[in-house]
Design a protein with these regions (language model features):
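Accessory carbohydrate-binding/adhesion or oligomerization-edge regions at the termini
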Residues: 16-80, 156, 160-165, 170, ...
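Active-site-adjacent substrate/metal-binding segments within catalytic domains
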Residues: 71-131, 195, 199-206, 261, ...
Length: 617
């Protein structure tokens, strides 16, 4: 019997290895349950270029003719499709089998992200619709499935990156990649999974670290409230630090004292384990969730950003999260971790995550490794003066902040990038609404309305400047005691902006100017183009970057060190930086590493440049 059991396990291991699920790791490590099924792997699909699939009732499909590997987008090599042209309509299908022991539980279908609009059908019946290409969403499919049975799951996707109604980030609005715009991502691009949850189970929790009072505050939300209890335990490497029990309702607040508190920081990224158990009236444990928390505080005093009540200088790198074979999707969990390690090896203490909402497992590794991040949406491509666009974006941004607010590695919320809209009503209204909304969801972090753009509502002031001469950069950033401000442009407005948008055709619009009342950072600079290939001259002419490229490697190092030292020398006025960028991305070849993550430079020299902090004065 023992021999048979051993043989069975060996055969099972071989079978699993042969049919390995891509991205098989648990996708939500800060809210983890045991009863789950990963739906990544082989699906069938069909493009719907005529947009007639609904009319032809493709939602009733039991399988399409072509195969795709989920969670990789059809534009990517890893999907097995690699279709590069625009995809406005697309259909997916796979079967889902509901385990028998999931009876009497809610069956929840989770999508890490689907770009852009998606509709979910079970056995031909409409179950849900979602707007937003970078935010996660959950569908309760309990009414449509039965335990012990197999069902048809169909996902319909719509996307039009050229519509101006949906944020698209750095996706091309032309057929081919150009400048700082790259291959598009359509459809499913993050993990899809099912989980079984008791009807009284936890829907979410908000964790608020309070290092001043040495306590962790937890606010739960439940699917249903039927009079049970919530038990929360805080542990330090298996040892109980604090334990509290409250009523299992969404008005409860759990306050966990944290004696001998260990704070989270890049120097010591300590994480406490958090265990949450829902107990019904009969004393049965009906839901268990594993989580973690970092005790850290970020706030602003005057012109400086503080971490754990100490001024903290951020040496960030721009990370766009693109991969040669997966586009927006990392090929593996190890690749996510490796990107952070590469950045730290280069001397950075964090990253501005640029024009893409990174998946939860990236933040998990940032939390574990002690890596600072700024959370940003993929805002490019949308018309900020358009009311429908604003409606779409506000919904998506809400879901982004609610999902990621518990990660200690996130210091700043930045919904948009380089938005310059000469408008006195709609753009200011959008920025002010985003500010109020973000503060209501998460009052613990600074809000940064638009990176390097027109600052309407913000807690920090940022500029972008790609001047390649260090002396000129210093003059531009700080000349005769005056910091670089937003441009003063005279705008010739189109007649359609008359009246409702508050501007007349001949009005001059002046962008908001810095008032020296908040931290000031240069959160894009550098971007030095360098491609030391065998075809040097040809590569330098066809690749893309900022300014005239250096003529030699030594000239590159000298320019880089000069630019960084210039910014550091202004630390009394410029409190942090973000260098462009971590890796090359397609034709944009100004990364510290190549697109495949191999080193481009002598990393000891690079680390020596980027690991420097300003001199204490």
């Amino acid at each position: 019997m023992k021999r048979i059991t051993t043989l069975s396990f060996f055969m099972l291991f071989c079978w699993i290895t042969a049919f390995a699920i891509p991205r098989a790791e648990y996708p939500r490590p800060q809210f983890e349950r045991n009863a789950w099924i990963n739906l990544n792997g082989e699906w069938t699909y069909s493009f719907d270029f005529g947009g007639s699939g609904l009319e032809r009732e493709w939602f009733k499909s039991t399988g399409f003719d072509q195969k795709i590997t989920v969670p990789f987008c059809p534009e990517s090599k890893l999907s097995g499709v690699e279709y590069k042209d625009f995809i406005n309509h697309m259909w997916y299908h796979r079967t889902i089998s509901i385990p028998q022991d999931w009876a009497n539980k809610q069956v929840l279908l989770n999508f890490g992200a689907v770009y852009y609009k998606s509709e979910i059908y079970i056995d031909g019946v409409f179950a849900a619709r979602h707007f937003g290409g970078t935010s996660s969403f959950q569908v309760d499919i309990t009414p449509y499935v039965k335990a012990g049975q197999t069902h048809n799951l169909v996902v319909y996707v719509e996307s039009d990156v050229r519509s101006t109604h949906q944020p698209s980030g750095k996706q091309n609005l032309q057929f081919a990649s150009y400048g700082c715009n790259y291959t598009r991502t359509t459809g499913i691009w993050q993990t899809v999974w099912m989980e079984a949850v008791h009807p009284e189970g936890l829907q979410s929790v908000q964790m608020i670290p309070d290092i001043d009072q040495q306590q962790l505050i937890i606010r739960p939300r439940f699917y249903k409230e039927l009079g049970g209890k919530l038990e929360v335990t805080l542990k330090d490497n298996g040892k109980v630090v604090s334990k509290e029990t409250v009523a299992a309702n969404s008005l409860s607040t759990v306050i966990l004292p944290v004696k001998k508190m260990k704070t989270w920081s890049p120097e010591n990224p300590f994480l406490y384990d958090v265990e949450l158990r829902v107990i019904d009236k009969a004393g049965n444990v009906v839901d268990e969730v594993k989580s973690y928390a970092g005790m850290r505080k970020v706030h602003i005093e005057g012109k400086k950003i503080y971490l754990n009540n100490q001024p903290y200088y951020q040496r960030l790198v721009l990370d766009q999260g693109f991969y040669p074979d997966g586009i927006w999707t990392a090929p593996s969990d190890e690749a996510l971790k490796k990107d952070i390690q590469l950045s730290m090896e280069a001397g950075f203490n964090g990253a501005r995550l640029h024009q893409k909402v990174f998946e939860e497992r990236f933040y998990y590794w940032a939390d574990k490794l002690g890596y600072l991040t700024w959370g940003e949406a993929s805002s490019w491509g949308m018309d900020c003066n358009d009311i429908e666009t604003a409606r779409n974006f506000i919904t998506e941004w809400t879901e982004i902040v609610e999902r990621d607010r518990n990660h200690p590695s996130i210091l700043i919320w930045t919904p948009t990038n380089e938005e310059f809209w000469p408008d006195r009503v709609q753009y200011p209204r959008l920025m002010q609404d985003l500010y109020k909304l973000t503060k209501a969801i998460d009052p613990t972090r600074p809000f940064h309305g638009t990176s390097g753009g027109s600052h309407i509502a913000t807690d920090i002031w940022t500029v972008h400047n790609y001047e390649q001469d260090p002396a000129k950069l210093k003059e531009l950033l700080y000349n005769d005691g005056k910091l670089m401000e937003a441009p003063k442009w005279e705008i010739q407005l189109m007649p359609k902006n008359i009246g409702f948008n508050g501007l007349k055709y001949t009005d001059q619009y002046t962008f908001p100017q810095y008032k020296h009342d908040m931290p000031y950072l240069i959160d894009e600079f550098g971007g030095i183009k360098w491609n030391p290939s065998q075809q040097m001259e040809s590569a330098q002419n066809t690749s893309w970057g900022y300014g005239e490229p250096p003529h030699s490697l030594e000239e590159f190092y000298a320019r880089l060190e000069g630019l960084v030292n210039t910014v550091l020398s202004l630390s009394d006025h410029v409190w942090g930086y973000c260098y462009t960028q971590l890796t090359d991305v397609e034709q944009e070849q100004n990364g510290i590493y190549y697109y495949d993550r191999s080193p481009k430079f002598d990393m000891k020299r690079i680390h020596a440049i980027f690991s420097k902090n300003p001199e204490t004065k």
